[in-house]
Amino acid sequence: GRSNSLVVPWFSCQTMITPWQLEGYRVHRLPVGHNFQLDADALANALAACRRQGEHPAVLTCETFGIQPSSKLIEVLKQARRDGVPVIVDRTHSFLAPSRTPADIEVVSTRKLLPLTEVAWVQADEDLSELVGTRDNKDVFLTSARRRFLKDRGLDTFEEAENLADDCWVPVPPDDDARAEFEGFNLAEFSRRVDQTRAALLSGLEVAQI
């Protein structure tokens, strides 16, 4: 039957969980390992417990900081899918690189990684277009507020955008200008700079350990 509960890592973004709660899903938060990924044994045990209690769980796993799952977690996720448990992966931190996570659905919010007002997506095997609403004044105001925040980063502009976002839970197409900005963004160069920063950070850590 339709899923009615969600298994998530403790270390995850609440904005990815709230929509499920608004749909009435019961949320089970599980511990993560040293790599911030779901603990594989805890996940397997939680899924078994959900089934014993008559729940129909789904799994939301997150590639936090771009970290990929361990081979053990990959096997647990594969088994979950074989058992008919939907697996959703939050690739907000990792969409610039390939993913090892076996999943049915991919969700990404680009503005958490890129200096853009919006553009997010849900990628799935089935057609989800009927779930997309129509932009209205609330969405226009939110886009404008996010632009003001990007130009003038402060608590006031941040709170203005976040307060408007609280009233905009229905997915709608992105603003045309925001879409054009994303399509024109040099993702390859940005990815190169991320790798460069990562290498510099790791090098600094090695020096600090000596």
Enumerate the language-model features and the residues they cover:
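A generic structural signal for well-ordered alpha-helical segments
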Residues: 20, 78-81, 205
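Conserved PLP-anchoring active-site segment centered on the Schiff-base-forming lysine
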Residues: 1-50
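Active-site phosphate-binding strand-loop segment of PLP-dependent enzymes
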Residues: 36-130
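PLP-dependent aminotransferase class I/II
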Residues: 60, 129-210
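Residues within well-ordered alpha-helices
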Residues: 16-18, 76, 201
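Pyridoxal 5′-phosphate
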Residues: 25, 55-56, 173
